[in-house]
């Protein structure tokens, strides 16, 4: 249900799409904070084994009500990462990405 609602939202919104290494990234809302998306994802790519990265189909960055409701910055759901656009710096974003990829590995 969550994915279906997001897909409908994504179809009706102006988005920025990026491909960084194996990651397909959809930016729903601009990132707030001193963050270099390319550098952050590049660091993750250099840090984690490649087979971990293939567990992620898409990364959504933005404001999501379900993140706020759960009081979390990021969430892994069915091959997708949902990450808040409110990030302090590169390390904050990297931490969120790696933490959620760890959940993908657990599954």
Show the residue positions of the predicted features.
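Active-site recognition of the HExxH zinc-binding catalytic motif
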Residues: 95-107
């Amino acid at each position: 249900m969550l994915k279906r609602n997001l897909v409908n939202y994504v179809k009706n919104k102006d988005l920025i799409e990026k491909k960084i290494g194996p990651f397909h990234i959809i930016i729903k809302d601009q990132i707030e904070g001193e963050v270099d998306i390319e550098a952050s994802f590049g660091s993750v790519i250099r840090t984690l084994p490649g087979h971990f990265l293939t567990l992620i189909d898409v990364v959504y960055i933005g404001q999501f009500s379900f993140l706020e409701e759960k009081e979390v910055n990021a969430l892994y759901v069915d091959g997708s990462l949902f990450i808040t656009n409110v990030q302090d710096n590169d390390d904050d974003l990297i931490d969120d990405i790696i933490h959620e990829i760890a959940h993908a590995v657990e599954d």
